[in-house]
Amino acid sequence: MIYHFTEEYDIIVIGAGHAGVEASLAASRMGCKVLLATINIEMLAFMPCNPSIGGSAKGIVVREVDALGGEMAKTIDKTYIQMKMLNTGKGPAVRALRAQADKELYSKEMRKTVENQENLTLRQTMIDEILVEDGKVVGVRTATHQEYAAKAVIVTTGTALRGEIIIGDLKYSSGPNHSLASINLADNLKELGLEIGRFKTGTPPRVKASSINYDVTEIQPGDEAPNHFSYTSRDEDYVKDQVPCWLTYTNGTSHEIIQNNLHRAPMFTGVVKGVGPRYCPSIEDKIVRFADKERHQLFLEPEGRNTEEVYVQGLSTSLPEDVQRDLVHSIKGLENAEMMRTGYAIEYDMVLPHQLRATLETKKISGLFTAGQTNGTSGYEEAAGQGIIAGINAALKIQGKPELILKRSDGYIGVMIDDLVTKGTIEPYRLLTSRAEYRLILRHDNADMRLTEMGREIGLVDDERWTRFEIKKNQFDNEMKRLDSIKLKPVKETNAKVEEMGFKPLTDAVTAKEFLRRPEVSYQDVVAFIGPAAEDLDDKIIELIETEIKYEGYISKAMDQVAKMKRMEEKRIPANIDWDDIDSIATEARQKFKLINPETIGQASRISGVNPADISILMVYLEGKNRSISKTLQKSK
């Protein structure tokens, strides 16, 4: 095939949502020449659904993206209108930050970053076709018949792939927020031999702030104590003048309106065929599935400082517009609310993720990567996490460097990608803390400790950031050593002070570290005995020290499990393995192995339907193969 390339790039990223911007920024910062193509340049890093970043598990992902050198955390720290630490009454493994965003300002701030990035070209154009020769990506073709050469292509199209918006009996071709749908590219991905699924998501109506009666709702303020997503943000820049959210509820009248109109609900009439998100169901789905519930929470979330639009979180729906209006007016505080936008469902094509490697490159086509909702996930944070990994690995592939694969013990991003490529997904995938078996070591307070060194090695962490990280790490290490070296003895003077502070007296000599391990003892209590550290420690380092010491036993057990799994991950499975050549494995295991083609014993062991006996047989088979290869090599000598 002869192509007429008018421009040449190392990497072309299709789609400028949260996955696309992270992918393009990472690759360009690693020295690649990148084109970021978007259907609508005004929607770069736009939030078509909830105006927030973070939340349970998701907030940790944002910090992981930041630790690797990504941009989401920095941008939300510049544009939030409220910041809140969730689950403060629970253990450290499930705590996470959540920010209400000024969604318009967030998009503008991210666009400024993209436009000013060296090696990165931003262009409004529709990509209709990915050009492939001999199983390798060579470029793309646009709707205006322009051909651009590329060594790698990253598809981050979100819900635009053959997108269709549904409101009642109205159904029309559209991407998110009524943008153009990408039809030809959806056809092209099928023609390239990729297996395609069909998912659905939805969004609630927006109401006018000045028409809400806030007096009958419950205020939900942000935190006064400073917190940030990015490790580069400063406490002195923390926004004090935050915008509150408000809590209200559905009621019996609301539920009756929905029940009386289920015959008009696309979810139940067969109009919606795509699979929806389990953990973010529509309000009509909730009313049917949880019929015993008298009410459901609804949060009224402002979409920014300079807009009247308020997002009604928890009221996602595709009911007809007249029913939505009645439903809104049945809710306390919204009796006279003006609906500014109608809620809708959107169906879209996605690439079944078992076809991907852990680098997010497709197994079928060399140089073709996918990330974000294209892979069947939901959420801006999940998209950003995949985007930065796809961008990094596309750049590393072009540069001939070793790939970056995050393990499940490295971060929630690693958990998510492993789940996708190993287990696949039959519904929009959402990250949850329960998905991570090592969640006690994958906390919000240690993402930089886990991943900054990786970011530095691949070239995404600059000298200033690295110096700050080294200072923090040294302060942490030095204080941990100090606490382990100083002893508190059960002498009269010490015990008098211990009892005065309300603690049980010492019976044996203990280190300061052991004393801090007591649940009721804080770091400041220990300092009262041993004096402060040589350097001033900020609250974040103190929090990290306390968590590491108080949960040391559990963390140690988790690290033992990580070591065992690492040994399994190091046992590679040949890419050309003949699964039919292995005797005695169960039929289901053989079928799953053929479908997913696991790359390591560890990955094979996590495939649903594969049992320990199948793994044992596989290991025996591989050991036999290795012995026979060794014998052949010895004979040839």
Swiss-Prot record:
One of its GO terms (biological process) is tRNA methylation. GO terms for cellular component: cytosol. FAD binds at residues 15-20, 127, 182, 373. InterPro entries: FAD/NAD-bd_sf, GIDA_C_N, MnmG, MnmG-rel, MnmG-rel_CS, MnmG_C, MnmG_C_subdom, MnmG_C_subdom_sf. Keywords: Cytoplasm, FAD, Flavoprotein, NAD, tRNA processing. Its cofactor is FAD. SMART domains: GIDA_assoc_3. NAD(+) binds at residues 276-290. One of its GO terms (molecular function) is flavin adenine dinucleotide binding. It is found in: Cytoplasm. PANTHER family: GLUCOSE INHIBITED DIVISION PROTEIN A (PTHR11806), PROTEIN MTO1 HOMOLOG, MITOCHONDRIAL (PTHR11806:SF0). NAD-binding protein involved in the addition of a carboxymethylaminomethyl (cmnm) group at the wobble position (U34) of certain tRNAs, forming tRNA-cmnm(5)s(2)U34. Homodimer. Heterotetramer of two MnmE and two MnmG subunits. Belongs to the MnmG family. This is tRNA uridine 5-carboxymethylaminomethyl modification enzyme MnmG. It comes from Streptococcus pneumoniae (strain Hungary19A-6). The gene is mnmG.
